[in-house]
Amino acid sequence: MIGQKTLYSFFSPSPARKRHAPSPEPAVQGTGVAGVPEESGDAAAIPAKKAPAGQEEPGTPPSSPLSAEQLDRIQRNKAAALLRLAARNVPVGFGESWKKHLSGEFGKPYFIKLMGFVAEERKHYTVYPPPHQVFTWTQMCDIKDVKVVILGQDPYHGPNQAHGLCFSVQRPVPPPPSLENIYKELSTDIEDFVHPGHGDLSGWAKQGVLLLNAVLTVRAHQANSHKERGWEQFTDAVVSWLNQNSNGLVFLLWGSYAQKKGSAIDRKRHHVLQTAHPSPLSVYRGFFGCRHFSKTNELLQKSGKKPIDWKEL
């Protein structure tokens, strides 16, 4: 039909048009509906508009990457932000020297989640030890004065027992069976050792014996109730720092759990003594007669360090 185009005509070459004399006025590109400019068939015929000052011209290659100085500034700002976050999350009663070297953990998502979990648990249940005693092990000596590391698993879950040192209980709570077996081994291994009549091992901790549980809190009367909540990752970080930044430490790994946790210890740099756990269930499988306490002192003396007075309780 005259005056109408077929679909095919849109894909056919346009017939040549007659050239008319130039108009005395400058040509202006026409507009279509609502004043929108019609597209020209030849983009090269339309002068390109210059981008405003400060903007890249269309089609120009992307700008060069950030300079080394800019990247360094970004990293420093990020590190400063993490430090501020860590400072807000410092737990109650965390020793200063330990905080200096371990505060990097406080801003990590797992630790923030862990602190939230423990806080929520305390709202609904009795949790041991109380908040100000969870990190007793950081208050007894400077992190750089640690000489011996004894790894435990889980805090005691009875009233007034756990106070932030593995195997240790507060006075006047009687020593639990595992600690009683430790005292029995001491009485045969260390000359003149006498049962102290209590279970508080703070005297060892003040001499540089780190008494560290893998999990640092527990719900009352429910052993292992706070396992796999993040404590293991945090105490792994503690052991890792000591492993990498100290020399000649003596690690006492009693039982398969402690031995697994200490499997990454550099045995060329430190001393590792392993045996069965002092629990009544396993004490006769190697703990009695292990002589770990006298052996520890021999190793410390070889390293030029002052031995532990195991009687000082």
From Swiss-Prot:
Record-level GO cellular component terms: mitochondrion; nucleoplasm; nucleus
Binding, dsDNA: H157, S178, S256, H277, S279, S282, R285
Broadest EC class assigned to this enzyme: hydrolase
Biased composition (Low complexity): 43-53
Keyword Kinase included in the entry's annotation: no
Pfam families noted in UniProt: UDG
Subunit details: Monomer.
Record's protein name: Uracil-DNA glycosylase
